[in-house]
Amino acid sequence: MIKAFATILVILLYAVFQSAVPVASEPRHHLKFENQYVRVFDVLVPPGDATLFHTHSNDYVFVTISGANLKAQVMGAQPVDLNLTSGEVRFTKAPLTHRVTNVGSTPFRNITVEILSSPSSTSSAASLENVPGHTLVLDNERVHVYRLVLEPGQSTGIHTHELSGLGVAVSTGEIEIESPGQQRQTVKLQPGDFRWHTGATTHSIKNVGSTRFEAVNIEWK
């Protein structure tokens, strides 16, 4: 009787520890912004720590801000090595239930960008391919993703984002943003800072700082 009870208890405890929470309830995922199109989480996992098993119900892109050596485990499967570097971008289809353990010596941080819906747009063309500083790094049925790299003094020139999107700073930087009919803005950015825009927007970005500036632009199709 005691042995049977102990076995049942072990099974129940295993079920508790294996149960998953929605991503918004996972304590290392910090919700920073949400509208009808996007949810943005700032994720931080210190060395030796792990997320809970959590479920992503929406497709998402993540931008690695601080890389680390990880173990990633999809629920029901064995853990696998996942070594990410700063600036790395990946797209994941939903649904996904998983957890991540930081087995390295550095904090792991990323910006997780959930795609809730697609704004109405008149174009699905890759609108930044010929813009200075931009390189297409990911393209699928949901998003275009570009890496932006500007050395000190470099500028994108005036260009138009035809699609709604989110820009995420990967490095520190001081940039000057100029839009037609508006005053120039000088903005100091930290890694993980982000900006959302709905609909088309036209501007130029110039690196007015003393170090290379890197960012990632995610455009909704």
Model-derived segments and spans:
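Ligand-binding loop in jelly-roll beta-barrel domains
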Residues: 95-116, 199-221
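Glycine- and acidic-residue-biased ligand/ion/polar-headgroup-sensing regions
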Residues: 57-71, 75, 162-181
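A short glycine-rich, His/Asp/Glu-containing loop-to-beta-strand
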Residues: 27-52, 57-62, 113, 128-158, ...
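Short beta-strand segments in beta-sandwich/barrel cores
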Residues: 51, 68-72, 89, 156, ...
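Short acidic-glycine-tyrosine-enriched beta hairpin
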Residues: 77-93, 183-198
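Histidine-centered metal-chelating micro-motifs
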Residues: 48-52, 90-100, 155-156, 193-206
